């Protein structure tokens, strides 16, 4: 049987869906539960869980510290997650993947530009409508219109440019390390999932990950 390896994104530990699936209320509890299962899987079944260093590792540790996780939990992360930097100079990625990525990025930029243009038009129109009847103060009109338009613009722009694509170095490192190690990617991120499929990598949704490991352990205990 081929050795099982998993490559974890930050969302494998921190995502809210993971907490719900485990029946816990905070990140500290979910992180500790996951690390305990990862430790058992490593000791009993030699299943290794990897995390890209230092991009994803630094992101995860920073998140856990901000959530005031116990020092013992941080020690478990350091102990049971194998930290490794992807060999970015040796990993081979098909040129077609880069072609698809650039094409996807260009389409998103164009959509983002159209959203920006629409936001400017909506701002001007709202300002005109609000200022005409009552001769409102200029600053009041600007503040009222801009706060509404900017919030709407941010949501639309973020969803258009960042949703379903790779938008950070940690995201890319997860895929590169998984490819290097022939490991399954563990995340709850549309962009990572989409490009993992494009690269022919196994993908495990973060909310299912602890239960998959537990299933391995339960079967082993029955032997």
Swiss-Prot record:
Pfam families: PIN_5. It comes from the Archaea. Belongs to the HARP family. RNA-free RNase P that catalyzes the removal of the 5'-leader sequence from pre-tRNA to produce the mature 5'-terminus. NCBIfam families: PRK04358.1-1 (NF003340), PRK04358.1-4 (NF003343), RNA_lig_partner (TIGR03875). Keywords: Endonuclease, Hydrolase, Nuclease, tRNA processing. Its EC number is 3.1.26.5. CDD domains: PIN_VapC-like. GO terms for molecular function: ribonuclease P activity. It comes from Methanococcus maripaludis (strain C6 / ATCC BAA-1332). It is an enzyme of class 3 (hydrolase). The lineage of its organism: Archaea, Methanobacteriati, Methanobacteriota, Methanomada group, Methanococci. This is RNA-free ribonuclease P. It catalyses: Endonucleolytic cleavage of RNA, removing 5'-extranucleotides from tRNA precursor. GO terms for biological process: tRNA 5'-leader removal.
